[in-house]
C-alpha cells in the first residue's frame, strides 16, 4: 500500500525532517516500465525551478508514487491507489458535518439504493460510511439548479476513480457531486463575465475539477500547473475524455511570447508551477487551488 498507518510523529518526521533526495532517486530508478511521456516530463521537472519549490512532504509522496507505478502490474490501473490516497481520497463521518448537512431534509429521505454496497477499495464499514455520506451529499444537491446539468457531465473519469452508487436511476460518486458544487461556485463568481473563461488550476490531481468544468462550459481555456506524476495522469485522462480539445504540454517553454502563443493556440495547456510567471498579467479569469 502507498501509506500504512503511522504515529503523528512518524508521519511528521517522514514528511518534513528526513531528507528526500528525489533527484538521486529518479536518477537511479529503473524506468523501463514507465511511460515515455512520463519520463520526459519528470526529466524536465527535476531540472526545473518547480523542483526547488517542492516541499519535502511532496518529494516524499512523489517517490512513493513512482515506486507504486513501477511495481503495479500492467493489467492494473496505476493511478487508482494514488488517486484515492493523495489526489482525492474519500470523506467519512464526523458529527458536526452530518448534523449541518442533514438540517434541510431530516426525516425526509426515502432510501432507494443499496446502502450496504461493498466497494473493492474499502472495508465494509468504510463502504457503508462512504455510502451514507454520498447519500447525504446527493440529498443536498439534487434539488439545486446546478444538478440539472447531470446528463451533460462526462462521468467516466469519476466512475473510474471513485466508489459509486445508483440513486434515482442516476449513478453518482462523491467527487462527481463535489466537483459539481465547485462548478456552481465558479459560475456564481464569474456570472458577470460574458465570454469564455480562462482558468488556471494549480494542483489538479487526476483532473476531476477540470473534467467537470470542461464538461459544462463551452470554449473555456484551461491551464493546469502541477508536478509529475500527477500532471502526466491529468493530461492522459483529459486527453482521453475530451479528444476534440486541443491539448498540449509546455514544460520546456522558457519564453513569455512562446508561452502566450501556446496558450492562445490550445484549449488545455499543461505547465509546471514556476512557469505561471510566463503568462501575461490578467491572463486568467479564475485561479483554482482545490
Regions found by a protein language model. Name each.
Residues 196, 283-284:
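Local beta-strand N-terminus motif with an aromatic residue
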Amino acid at each position: 500500500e502507498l501509506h500504512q498507518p503511522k504515529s503523528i510523529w512518524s508521519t511528521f518526521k517522514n514528511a518534513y525532517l528526513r531528507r528526500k533526495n528525489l533527484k538521486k532517486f529518479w536518477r537511479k530508478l529503473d524506468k523501463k516500465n514507465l511511460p515515455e511521456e512520463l519520463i520526459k516530463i519528470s526529466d524536465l521537472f527535476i531540472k526545473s525551478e518547480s523542483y526547488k519549490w517542492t516541499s519535502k512532504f511532496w518529494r516524499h509522496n512523489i517517490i512513493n508514487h513512482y515506486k507504486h507505478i513501477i511495481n503495479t502490474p500492467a493489467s492494473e490501473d496505476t493511478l487508482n491507489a494514488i488517486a484515492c490516497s493523495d489526489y482525492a481520497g474519500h470523506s467519512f463521518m464526523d458529527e458536526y458535518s452530518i448534523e449541518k448537512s442533514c438540517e434541510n431534509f431530516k426525516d425526509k429521505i426515502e432510501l432507494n439504493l443499496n446502502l450496504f454496497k461493498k466497494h473493492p477499495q474499502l472495508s465494509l464499514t468504510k463502504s457503508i460510511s462512504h455510502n451514507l455520506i454520498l447519500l447525504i451529499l446527493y440529498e443536498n444537491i439534487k434539488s439545486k439548479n446546478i444538478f440539472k446539468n447531470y446528463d451533460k457531465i462526462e462521468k467516466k473519469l469519476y466512475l473510474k476513480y471513485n466508489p459509486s452508487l445508483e440513486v434515482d436511476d442516476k449513478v453518482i460518486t462523491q467527487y462527481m457531486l463535489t466537483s459539481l458544487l465547485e462548478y456552481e461556485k465558479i459560475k456564481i463568481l464569474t456570472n458577470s463575465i460574458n465570454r469564455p473563461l480562462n482558468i488556471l488550476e494549480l494542483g489538479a490531481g487526476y483532473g476531476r475539477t477540470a473534467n467537470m468544468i470542461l464538461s459544462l462550459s463551452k470554449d473555456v481555456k484551461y491551464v493546469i500547473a502541477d508536478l509529475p506524476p500527477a500532471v502526466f495522469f491529468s493530461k492522459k485522462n483529459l486527453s482521453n475524455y475530451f479528444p476534440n480539445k486541443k491539448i498540449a504540454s509546455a514544460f520546456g517553454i522558457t519564453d513569455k511570447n512562446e508561452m502566450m502563443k501556446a496558450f492562445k493556440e490550445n484549449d488545455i495547456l499543461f505547465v509546471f508551477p514556476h512557469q505561471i510567471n510566463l503568462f501575461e498579467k490578467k491572463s486568467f479569469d479564475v485561479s483554482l487551488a482545490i
